[in-house]
């Protein structure tokens, strides 16, 4: 992860562990423990709902759908449970100082060679454990803006089911918010609106129990440059500067994530069974009716292990995330018929949008040597719960007008290019039509608004002060495509970074703003000098060359099973049902038709809560 490892490790400590194995005789006589690693425990059994993926969204669904004791639910997760290595997940700063990137605990995905990033292959770590990426991310809890969520709703069909008010309700349902400790509140001058938050949900949110001087200086400097402190960024306007919440449970200062929030409290439900360490290799369909009916799934521990089958009485729900969900659909015969036919896969539903529309927050970080070591934050896990609760969370979501002296000029370029981009893509006519509508919405609604095109993040860690910039609404579009029938072979991941040069221009201006911040008081008073990229980078060309060599993922891929009308290349409808099927849904970040200007955890929790209500008919 050259060029980004110093700051990206904050959200990429991927750790797995062994899990207990318990035998289950049948669905009606569960053991008291719901989690097993033995594939035979589900083999041949039938459940009302089979959930593919025990990650951020999957465990929300497992909890809500199994609340009725008369409803049986099975979850199949490729990773292990993580219970034996619990501290690596629940200690917040363990994600900084005990990283498992590029180990067995990491999916170890990589992109294809990126033409516009010096042909580099970027590392794409993803959580492979119960809880998914909510178990291993940087703990940022940031919500999107009302403007972009309503654009999502309109693109999806306009029924209002996915309006801001609907998603906000789901996000609040998932949250139990607690205010900051007084010392941190006073130092960082934190103000908040408790009414914007949930108080009884499974996921704890609060601010870390300690903070560091550069965090305060970052906030004050950003405020002095823009005058945009936001004291209520969770109620539909996330623009401005603030210290974001972290997904931390204030009662014990531990990470709050989907496993310990949604699964552990219900671990004795006799109607819920969670299988870990097994990969779903394909969905089984009955194709005798008008629409294909999902009747179950095949799964296995590895390509060398026995294949098993579990049956679904009501529905199969895919919650594999932006990479694995389109992969599973394609392996099961749902996707672009040309791709599937070329691999010898029987076409169940010709849906050319599967795997298309991939969007990611591309980012990089600048680093600065602090004048005093004490200003560089922690360097290891201490064993003190409050001290170890510190994670980076200072952010500034800056508008187009703050990045460019002439906002109208850059906006005009974006709007002109938006009318042309889709036609340049080698995709089906339906996908092209949907992309064209999305581009027009970005150009005409999102970019002219206060919705931020670039996020600035202030970090202290590893003896350094670093500030990161991340593009929030990329114009470039990529794809996820399988390359073989082998379910254990990784798909081709092509985010197509900087295929649209305007993405590079937007991010470039973000870094120029960061340099300006570093040279302004009070932040400059704790900085000795800039170490990365250093003073050799001065011209626009210098900046762009450095970005191409240093940029990577901010770990927020989305939109590969887009919620759009089928005629616009959509994969799921507003009920999250896959087109051409009667009972197959996708519930995860892959369904958002456009990227959101936030860290995705809050969106996925809210989305899954809304999805559960839809499935249950609430």
From Swiss-Prot:
The keyword Zinc is assigned to this record: no
Keyword annotations from UniProtKB, A to Z: Allergen, FAD, Flavoprotein, Lipid-binding, Oxidoreductase, Secreted, Signal
Subcellular location: Secreted
Chief location category: secreted
Entry's cofactor comment: Binds 1 FAD per subunit.
Signal peptide region: 1-23
Gene Ontology cellular component terms for the protein in this record: extracellular region
SUPFAM superfamilies the UniProt entry points to: FAD-linked reductases, C-terminal domain, FAD/NAD(P)-binding domain
Cofactors (names): FAD
Enzyme class: oxidoreductase
GO molecular function, one term: lipid binding
Positions with a binding annotation for FAD: 129, 280
Summary of the function given for this chain in its UniProt record: The recombinant protein is not active with choline, glucose, myo-inositol, methanol, ethanol, 1-pentanol, benzyl alcohol, 2-phenylethanol, cholesterol or lauryl alcohol as substrates. Binds membrane lipids including phosphatidylinositol (PtdIns)(4)-phosphate (P), PtdIns(4,5)P2, phosphatidic acid (PA), and to a lower extent PtdIns(3,4,5)P3, cardiolipin and 3-sulfogalactosyl ceramide (sulfatide).
Quaternary structure and partners: Monomer.
Family label: Belongs to the GMC oxidoreductase family.
Protein name: GMC oxidoreductase family protein Mala s 12.0101
């Amino acid at each position: 992860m050259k060029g980004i490892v110093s700051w990206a490790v904050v959200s990429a400590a991927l750790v797995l562990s062994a899990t207990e194995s318990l035998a289950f005789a049948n669905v009606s006589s569960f053991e008291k423990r719901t989690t097993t690693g033995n594939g035979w425990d589900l083999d041949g059994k039938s459940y009302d709902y089979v959930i593919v993926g025990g990650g951020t969204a999957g465990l929300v669904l497992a909890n809500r759908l199994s609340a009725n004791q008369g409803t049986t639910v099975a979850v199949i997760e490729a990773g292990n449970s993580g219970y034996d290595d619990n501290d690596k997940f629940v200690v917040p700063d363990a994600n900084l100082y005990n990283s498992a990137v590029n180990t067995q605990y990491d999916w170890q995905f990589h992109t294809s060679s990126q033409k516009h990033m010096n042909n580099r292959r970027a590392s794409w770590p993803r959580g492979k454990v119960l809880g998914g990426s909510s178990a291993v991310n940087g703990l940022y809890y940031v919500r999107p803006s009302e403007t972009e969520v309503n654009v999502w709703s309109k693109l999806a069909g306009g029924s209002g089911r996915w309006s801001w008010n609907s998603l906000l309700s789901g996000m609040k349902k998932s949250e139990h918010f607690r205010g900051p400790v007084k010392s941190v509140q006073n130092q960082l001058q934190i103000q908040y609106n408790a009414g914007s938050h949930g108080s009884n949900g499974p996921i704890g949110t609060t601010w870390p129990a300690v903070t560091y001087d550069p965090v305060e200086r970052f906030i004050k400097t950003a405020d002095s440059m823009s005058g945009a402190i936001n004291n209520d960024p969770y109620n539909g306007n996330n623009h401005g500067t603030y210290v974001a919440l972290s997904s931390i449970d204030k009662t014990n200062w531990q990470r709050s994530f989907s496993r310990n929030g949604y699964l552990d409290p219900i671990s004795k439900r006799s109607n819920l069974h969670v299988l870990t360490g097994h990969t779903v290799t394909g969905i089984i369909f009955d194709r005798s009716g008008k629409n294909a009916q999902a009747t179950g799934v095949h799964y296995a521990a590895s390509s060398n292990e026995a294949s098993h089958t579990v049956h679904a009485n009501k529905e199969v729900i895919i919650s594999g995330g932006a990479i694995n969900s389109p992969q599973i659909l394609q392996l099961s015969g749902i996707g672009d018929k040309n791709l599937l036919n070329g691999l010898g896969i029987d076409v169940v539903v010709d849906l050319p949008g599967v795997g298309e529309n991939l969007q990611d927050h591309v980012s990089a970080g600048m680093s600065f040597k602090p004048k005093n070591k004490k200003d560089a934050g922690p360097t290891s896990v201490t064993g003190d719960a409050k001290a170890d609760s510190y994670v980076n969370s200072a952010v500034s979501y800056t508008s187009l007008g703050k990045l460019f002296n002439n906002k109208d000029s850059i906006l005009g370029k974006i709007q002109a290019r938006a009318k042309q981009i889709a036609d340049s893509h080698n995709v089906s006519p339906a996908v092209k039509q949907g992309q064209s509508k999305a581009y027009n919405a970005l150009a005409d609604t999102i970019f002219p608004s206060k919705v931020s095109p670039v996020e600035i993040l202030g970090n202290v860690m590893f003896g350094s002060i670093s500030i990161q910039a991340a593009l929030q609404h990329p114009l470039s579009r990529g794809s996820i495509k399988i390359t073989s029938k082998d379910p254990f072979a990784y798909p081709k991941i092509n985010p197509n970074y900087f295929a649209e040069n305007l993405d590079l221009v937007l991010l470039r201006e973000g870094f120029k703003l960061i340099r300006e911040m570093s040279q302004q008081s009070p932040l400059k008073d704790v900085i000795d000098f800039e170490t990365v990229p250093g003073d050799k980078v001065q011209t626009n060309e210098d900046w762009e060359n450095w970005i191409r060599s240093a940029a990577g993922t901010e770990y927020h891929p989305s939109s590969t099973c887009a919620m759009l009308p089928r005629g616009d290349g959509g994969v799921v409808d507003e009920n999250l049902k896959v087109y051409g099927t009667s009972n197959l849904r996708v519930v995860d970040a892959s369904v958002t038709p456009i990227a959101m200007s936030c860290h995705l955890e809050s969106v996925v929790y809210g989305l899954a809560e809304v999805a559960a209500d839809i499935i249950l008919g609430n």
